[in-house]
Regions:
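Solvent-exposed loop/turn segments at secondary-structure junctions
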Residues: 105-106, 143, 169-173
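Sec/Tat signal peptide C-region and signal peptidase I cleavage site
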Residues: 26-32
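Early exported N-terminus immediately downstream of N-terminal targeting peptides
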Residues: 35-114
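Short beta-strand edge/turn micro-motifs at domain boundaries
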Residues: 148-173
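Surface-exposed, charged secondary-structure patches
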Residues: 109-149
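Alpha-helix boundary/capping and short turn/kink residues
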Residues: 19, 93, 108, 172-173
Length: 173
């Protein structure tokens, strides 16, 4: 009986050691997202947006720049899936890819045209905090002749890289 117990203990030890070795040998996910990383990413995005606004470029050039910024910092596939709603689950990969590309262009044109409103204004990051499984980065937009308004960016690394997946403007998604 003593032999069976000690053999079982050795087996458990060996199994535990093997599992532990495998766990450490597997590629580990990059360290968890932090408030500083989320805030820093939005600071960079806002800096690039402010540079485009202040560039004096033609609207078409600004729209092209905005699309590059959007693709660089936004989780465009996640946002497109959300915009498509339940139909996204039924769409093929090719359909989702085509929709995502069209959605990316649409958002870039629609909101890129609004850059004119920001000329002479700015967006400033003021705070960041953890929420559920993501971070909220809070900023304030200041436009000429208008009261400052609140912008909240939801940031996550679930897609494999640091991206924003939602913007709330004055409480509206």
């Amino acid at each position: 009986m003593l032999n069976d117990t000690s053999a079982l203990s050795r087996r458990r030890f060996a199994a535990g050691l093997a599992l532990g070795t495998i766990a450490f040998a597997m590629p580990m996910r990059v360290a968890a997202l932090t408030v500083e990383q989320a805030r820093g990413m939005i600071d960079k995005a806002v800096g690039e947006i402010n540079a485009v606004i202040g560039s004096g470029k033609a609207e078409s050039a600004m729209i092209g720049d905005f699309e590059k910024i959007f693709v660089k910092y936004a989780d465009v596939p996640a946002i497109a899936r959300s915009a498509l709603g339940p139909a996204a689950k039924q769409a093929s990969k090719a359909q989702m890819s085509a929709f995502t590309k069209a959605f990316q262009g649409y958002i870039s044109r629609k909101y890129g045209r609004r850059f004119r409103e920001f000329i002479g204004g700015s967006v400033e990051v003021t705070d960041a905090k953890p929420l559920k499984s993501y971070y909220e980065v809070i900023s304030v937009a200041k436009l000429k002749g208008e009261a400052p308004f609140d912008l909240r960016w939801h940031v996550s690394d679930k897609s494999g890289s640091l991206k924003f997946f939602n913007i709330i403007i004055e409480g509206v998604n």
